[in-house]
Curated annotation (Swiss-Prot):
EC number of this enzyme: 2.7.7.23, 2.3.1.157
Protein's name according to its UniProt entry: Bifunctional protein GlmU
Organism the protein comes from: Dechloromonas aromatica (strain RCB)
Major subcellular site: cytoplasm
Positions of the catalytic residues: 358
Length: 452
C-alpha cells in the first residue's frame, strides 16, 4: 500500500512558533508517532505532506524511507492529498493518516485496510459528543453514502453520533480522478477529502467502515489542552501495559515513559518517575519516587532511592543508589556499588563493592574494587582547558574532604588521610596525607564589632 500522512496544518490554537505536528507526546513529535506506526504496515511508499513550518518539519522528521510533498496553501484535506499524487506507488490501496492524530494502533489500521479490499473504507467512531466532527450519513439500508462536515450539517445531521475520523483507505487507481472532481463550494471554501465518498457511491463502489478499539485512538491535537489530555491517555496506556506485564507501579497515573522501557520480573517503580530514551531494568530493580533515568541499564536487584538523575549510564547488579544521586554520561558501576546522597559521577568506571556514600564528585576516574570514598572527596579533573584522569586502585580508603588533583594514581591498598590534597601519586599499602600542622593560640579573642 501507499501511505500519505497529512502534516501541513498551522495549528493556530497551539499559540506556538513550533509547527503543530512537531509538538511532543511522550518525548516524540506527534507526526513521528504516526510515521512509526505507518512503518509497521510496510508500505510501498510513505509520503508526508508538509506546509506550515516547511523545512523545520522536513529536517526534524527526515528519514531515508520518507517521500515529501509540499502543500504551499492549505486549501483542505483533498487538496493536501492531491499534492502527493505524483509520489504514489502502484499499490492497490492508499491509506491517508494525519500527523496530529498520533495514537491510532496498527491493529486498527489493519482492520481498516482489510475492510477496504476492492472498496473504499473509512475509519469512524461513535462519540457521546460529536461536536466539531464530520457526520457519517447512511441510507435506510445502513450503507454509508456521505460525510457531512459540522459547518455544513443540518440540525438533523448534527444529531448523528457516528463521526468521521479522517482516516481512510482509498483505491489508488480511482484517487486521482476523484480528487480532480472535488469542489470547494462549502462553508470553508476548501476541498474536502471526505467528498470522495459521494463520488464512490455514485460510481457504485462499496463504502465500508471500521472502528477503533477506543476513542483515544482517533483523537487529534489542536490545542495545548488536547495535547496534555492525549499525553495523559498515552501514559496511562503505557502504564497499563507495564502492569499487565508484571511491573508494580505505585500509581499508574504518575509515570512518564518518553522512550523504550524494558524490564525483568518483580520490578517496582514509585510515583513521579520519568524514563527517557532506552532504559533497561533487570529483575527485582526498585526505583524510588521522582527519579529520572535516560538511556540507562540497571542490573538485577539494584535499589534506587528518591530524586536520582541518571543519564547514559550502566549500573551493575545489587547496587544501592541515592537519594539525590547523579550519574552523568559515561558512568559504569560494577556489582554492589553504593552511590549515596549528593554524589555526582561523570565518565567514570567504579569497581565492585566500592562506595561513595555522600557529598562527593567523581569525574574522569577509574576506581577499583572495595574502595571507600569519604564524604567531601573531589576528583579535580579540569584545569580550565583540559580534562585529566584519576586512577584509584583496589582496596583504597580515601578520608573525608580529600582532593585528588588529576592526573594522579592511588596505589592498591593505600589510605589517604582526611583533608589531603593529593598532587602526586600515592604509593600502595601506605598512608598518605597532606595538611598543615595544627596550631593553638592561647588567649586569642575574636574581633568585636564596634558600635558607631
Amino acid at each position: 500500500m501507499n501511505i500519505v500522512i497529512l502534516a501541513a496544518g498551522q495549528g493556530k490554537r497551539m499559540h506556538s512558533n513550533l509547527p503543530k505536528v512537531l509538538h511532543p507526546i511522550a518525548g516524540k513529535p506527534l507526526a513521528q508517532h504516526v510515521i512509526d506506526t505507518a512503518r509497521q504496515l510496510s508500505p510501498e511508499k510513505l509520503i508526508v505532506v508538509y506546509g506550515h513550518g516547511g523545512e523545520v518539519v522536513r529536517s526534524t522528521l527526515a528519514a531515508p524511507d520518507l517521500s515529501w510533498a509540499e502543500q504551499a496553501q492549505q486549501l483542505g484535506t483533498g487538496h493536501a492529498v492531491a499534492q502527493a499524487l505524483s509520489e504514489l506507488g502502484s499499490a492497490a490501496q492508499t491509506l491517508v493518516l494525519y500527523g496530529d492524530v498520533p495514537l491510532t494502533t496498527v491493529a486498527t489500521l489493519k482492520r481498516l485496510l482489510q475492510a477496504g479490499k476492492d472498496a473504499l473504507s473509512v475509519l469512524t467512531v461513535d462519540l457521546a459528543n460529536p461536536s466539531g466532527y464530520g457526520r457519517i450519513v447512511r441510507d435506510g439500508a445502513g450503507n454509508m453514502i456521505s460525510i457531512v462536515e459540522e459547518k455544513d450539517a443540518s440540525a438533523e445531521q448534527k444529531a448523528i453520533r457516528e463521526v468521521n475520523t479522517g482516516i481512510m483507505a482509498v483505491p489508488t487507481a480511482r484517487l486521482a480522478d476523484w480528487l480532480g472532481k472535488l469542489k470547494n463550494d462549502n462553508a470553508q471554501g476548501e476541498y474536502y477529502l471526505t467528498d470522495i465518498i459521494a463520488l464512490a457511491v455514485a460510481e457504485g463502489m462499496p463504502v465500508r467502515t471500521a472502528q477503533p478499539e477506543g476513542e483515544w485512538e482517533v483523537l487529534g491535537v489542536n490545542s495545548k489542552v488536547q495535547l496534555a489530555e492525549l499525553e495523559r491517555q498515552h501514559q496511562l496506556n503505557l502504564a497499563g501495559e507495564l502492569l499487565v506485564a508484571g511491573v508494580r507501579l505505585a500509581d499508574p497515573a504518575r509515570i512518564d515513559i518518553r522512550g523504550e522501557l524494558t524490564h525483568g520480573r518483580d520490578v517496582a517503580i514509585d510515583v513521579g518517575c520519568v524514563f527517557e530514551g532506552k532504559v533497561e531494568l533487570a529483575d527485582a530493580v526498585e526505583v524510588g519516587p521522582y527519579c529520572v533515568l535516560k538511556n540507562v541499564k540497571v542490573g538485577a536487584g539494584t535499589r534506587i532511592a528518591a530524586f536520582c538523575h541518571f543519564e547514559d549510564a550502566v549500573i551493575g547488579p545489587d547496587g544501592v543508589l541515592g537519594p539525590y544521586a547523579r550519574l552523568r554520561p559515561g558512568t559504569e558501576l560494577g556489582p554492589e556499588v553504593h552511590i549515596g546522597n549528593f554524589v555526582e559521577v561523570k565518565k567514570s568506571i567504579i569497581g565492585a563493592q566500592s562506595k561513595a556514600n555522600h557529598l562527593a564528585y567523581i569525574g574522569d576516574a577509574e576506581i577499583g574494587q572495595r574502595v571507600n570514598v569519604g564524604a567531601g572527596t573531589i576528583t579535580c579533573n579540569y584545569d580550565g582547558a583540559n580534562k585529566f584522569k584519576t586512577v584509584i586502585e583496589d582496596d583504597v580508603f580515601i578520608g573525608s574532604d580529600t582532593q585528588l588533583v588529576a592526573p594522579v594514581t592511588v596505589g592498591r591498598g593505600a589510605t589517604l588521610g582526611a583533608g589531603t590534597t593529593l598532587t602526586k601519586d600515592a604509593p600502595p599499602d601506605a598512608l598518605t596525607f597532606s595538611r598543615p600542622r595544627q596550631m593553638t593560640l592561647p588567649g586569642w579573642e575574636r574581633p568585636k564589632k564596634v558600635k558607631k
